[in-house]
């Protein structure tokens, strides 16, 4: 009898599964990645039976269940590993396991940085440069995780890409001492200080609000935020010998977002005292020669290294980025799968708010370090994320620009008739009488 297309006498019943919620066994060979691509509503549960596997350097414990949602990531097998998994959206036929040929570069980098830490009280200050989807953030996360494994270090992770919501909401740049293991289940690396109980140690980021989506909307403001963050980082390194010896890992935006002359990188190197540059590209890529020629005199050619694009890096589109940004905002107010938080909604009069917004060259505004007052209307503020600064409510714009960030709030409703707003706060209490900055991000519950 003729068989149906795609099905023959050798096809097992397991291969005919079209997605269920049963446990399935998978063996990942040593040195290989299981490349996972989860939908926003999909949920994957993984349990390791034997062997050692990592997610960006964070090892998964044997016999513990890990839950993942809305994430594209690889599980790397340090040694041959048997694990169980279940997910209604995955089938045994759609699983992708491939050899990873770039981990040797990451190992070499880790031991090079470790040698610097062991021989000097001033740790390495590394900036990672490359194009989109080359693995800059993956490399940053892995190097931070390996530093924690090797010794009692607290590497300072510095995120300079406002579109990456790591330990904070999108639209910010931040510096975070990685003081303990990262949460392997979260694309946002883990949670910052929270009012709820958490399974893992919270991280405390130092945050500067840029407020816009793309750095080319206001390069001057972006560079000013880096300068201010650099001052905070310098103070932290001066006061904390452990962080100073651990060093910094600086994650940058895609090279395509920077000026042709790479002026932003010069600024980053100066303000953060960078002494090592890692370039994710091939040796034949024009970027490699350009970087060596541009930064060789500044850093020394012996301190500039190339690394091939990392294996296991998933292609991401704008829809996926938006989904991660939305997830990070939701987690800020409501918590993650393991940590439920209860935000606090309050009513606020129009007269009790002073809100500014950064200038934006795409809105026919001058792209410089300047803030403009915001008129309170539904079109301006409905569903908007606002940054609450430490500056007093009636402070001038220069003071507001330089002020640290107290936290973030979500404006869920603007009632013009009653001249009131409904504001969601992460903690109970009154809205602080502080100046606020409108960001470009919105969240519709």
UniProtKB/Swiss-Prot annotation:
ATP binds at residues 33, 72, 133-138. Gene3D superfamilies: Clp1, DNA binding domain, P-loop containing nucleotide triphosphate hydrolases, Pre-mRNA cleavage complex subunit Clp1, C-terminal domain. Keywords: ATP-binding, mRNA processing, Nucleotide-binding, Nucleus. InterPro entries: Clp1, Clp1/Grc3, Clp1_C, Clp1_C_sf, Clp1_N, Clp1_N_sf, CLP1_P, P-loop_NTPase. GO terms for molecular function: ATP binding; polynucleotide 5'-hydroxyl-kinase activity; RNA binding. Pfam families: Clp1 (PF06807), CLP1_N (PF16573), CLP1_P (PF16575). Signal peptide: none annotated. GO terms for cellular component: mRNA cleavage factor complex; nucleus. Its main location: nucleus. Belongs to the Clp1 family. Clp1 subfamily. Component of the cleavage factor IA (CF IA) complex, which is involved in the endonucleolytic cleavage during polyadenylation-dependent pre-mRNA 3'-end formation. Associates with HRB1/CF IB to form the cleavage factor I (CF I) complex. CF I is required for correct positioning of a larger protein complex, the cleavage and polyadenylation factor (CPF) complex, which contains the catalytic subunits executing mRNA cleavage and polyadenylation. CLP1 mediates interactions between CF IA and CPF factors. Component of the cleavage factor IA (CF IA) complex, which is a heterohexameric complex with 2:2:1:1 stoichiometry of RNA14, RNA15, PCF11 and CLP1. It contains 2 copies of an RNA14-RNA15 dimer and 1 copy of CLP1-PCF11. The complex interacts with the cleavage factor HRB1/CF IB to form the cleavage factor I (CF I) complex, and binds to RNA. Interacts directly with PCF11. Interacts with the CPF components CFT1, PTA1, PFS2, YSH1 and SSU72. HAMAP family: Clp1. This is mRNA cleavage and polyadenylation factor CLP1. It comes from Saccharomyces cerevisiae (strain ATCC 204508 / S288c).
């Amino acid at each position: 009898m003729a068989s149906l297309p795609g099905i023959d006498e050798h096809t097992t019943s397991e291969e005919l599964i079209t997605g269920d919620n049963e446990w399935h066994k998978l063996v990942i060979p040593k040195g290989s990645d299981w490349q996972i691509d989860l939908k926003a509503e999909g949920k994957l549960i993984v349990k390791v039976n034997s062997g050692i596997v990592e997610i960006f350097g964070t090892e998964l414990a044997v016999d513990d269940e890990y839950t993942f949602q809305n994430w594209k990531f690889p599980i790397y097998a340090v040694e041959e590993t048997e694990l169980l998994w279940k997910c209604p959206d995955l089938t045994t036929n759609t699983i992708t396991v491939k050899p990873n040929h770039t981990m040797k570069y990451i190992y070499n980098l880790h031991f090079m940085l470790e040698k610097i830490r062991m021989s000097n009280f001033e740790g390495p200050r590394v900036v990672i440069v490359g194009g989109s989807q080359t693995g800059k953030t993956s490399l940053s996360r892995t190097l931070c995780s390996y530093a924690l494994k090797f010794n009692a270090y607290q590497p300072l992770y510095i995120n300079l890409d406002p579109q990456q919501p790591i330990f904070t909401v999108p639209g910010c740049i931040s510096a975070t001492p990685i003081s303990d293991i990262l949460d392997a289940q979260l694309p946002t690396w883990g949670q910052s200080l929270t009012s709820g109980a958490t399974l893992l140690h919270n991280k405390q980021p130092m945050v500067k609000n840029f407020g816009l989506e793309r750095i080319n909307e206001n390069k001057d403001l972006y560079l000013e935020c880096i300068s201010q963050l650099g001052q905070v980082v310098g103070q932290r390194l001066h006061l904390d010998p452990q962080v100073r010896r651990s060093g910094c890992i600086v994650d940058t935006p895609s090279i395509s977002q920077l000026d042709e002359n790479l002026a932003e990188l010069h600024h980053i190197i100066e303000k953060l005292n960078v002494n090592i540059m890692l370039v994710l590209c091939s040796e034949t890529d024009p970027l490699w020669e350009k970087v060596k020629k541009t930064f060789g005199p500044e850093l020394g050619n012996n301190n500039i290294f190339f690394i091939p694009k990392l294996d296991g890096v998933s292609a991401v589109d704008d829809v996926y980025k938006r989904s991660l940004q939305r997830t990070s905002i939701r987690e800020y107010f409501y918590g993650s799968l393991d940590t439920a938080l209860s935000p606090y909604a309050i009513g606020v009069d129009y007269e009790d708010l002073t809100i500014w917004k950064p200038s934006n060259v795409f809105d026919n505004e001058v792209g410089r370090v300047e803030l403009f007052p915001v008129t309170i209307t539904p079109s301006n503020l409905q569903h908007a994320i606002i940054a609450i600064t430490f500056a007093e409510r009636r402070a001038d714009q220069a003071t507001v620009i330089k002020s640290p960030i107290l936290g973030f709030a979500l404006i869920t409703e603007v009632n013009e008739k009653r001249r009131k707003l409904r504001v969601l706060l992460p903690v109970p209490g009154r809205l602080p009488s502080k100046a606020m900055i409108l960001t470009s991000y919105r969240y519709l519950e």
